[in-house]
Amino acid sequence: MNKTAIKNYAVWARNELIERVTRKAYEYGVEKENIVADECAEIVNGRLLNDDEKKQRKELIKVINEKGFDQVIEEVAYTWFNRFIALRFMEVNNYMPQKVRVFTNSENEFKPQLLDEAITLDLEGVDKEKVYELIDTNQRDELYKMLLLAICNDMGNYLPGMFTTISDYTMLLFPDNLLKEDSVLGKLISDIDEDTWQDQVQAIGWMYQYYISEKHDQVVNILKGKVKKEDIPAATQLWTTDWVVRYMVDNSLGRYWIERNPESPLKEKLAYLATSKNNDLPIVNERVNPKDITFLEIKTRYLIQFNVA
């Protein structure tokens, strides 16, 4: 895995997405220091808004008034980065339930199969007449936007935690010109080898780590004092490498089981289990059924119960 390439891309992508999302906000008359026209305006910067855009713009202004411009732009930029990375990971590993590559073709060229199969795709929210119209008028960017948004919404049926239905201001701020070679998607394909994504979740973890690295360095600077509430994720949510996770699990849940089942063959598989010099562990005279174990994962606050046949 080329972590240098991942870092260079992720740091660049964050700044690029923030700039693109900021431009989209500007198109709808929303700037950091100024909001052009009131929240119910029908025409903004010479643009006639449809009903969805008016609703989304009104919500955007409301959220900005609550959270602040920079925070909202940062959140939207990360939302799109997160989804793009997840989709790339899934298409490379053939995990897409729609059985279509969203960014590349079968040769891993930046020629989305999604566009080639636009006519035959059966996705909720895709108007076939609109598809034909966009194809006939060669509006590839607009067609790609419609299809990509539909894919993201459809993915909500499979991964609702990551792909919540997009109908709010997040859609309004969807970045433009994604089919260009120097776009966030174009460079995602050209700068990160396809093999990188076959290293399972490691690639996603390092992408996140480097994406927030600049923000992390800013907010944890002790000279700036206390970390703000909205900056806590960037300051604390760092990628935990595979060996650290294995060490934690081996010496918590794994140790708990081996102490109560000293003859268990599982011990040979716990590569990071810490034992005494004699390779011994204390024996606890307590029989336990795996189904009865409830494990608290403190970092995510999940209670995990095991269902073992």
Identify what each model region corresponds to.
Residues 1-309:
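Preference for the N-terminal adenyl/adenosyl cofactor-binding alpha/beta module
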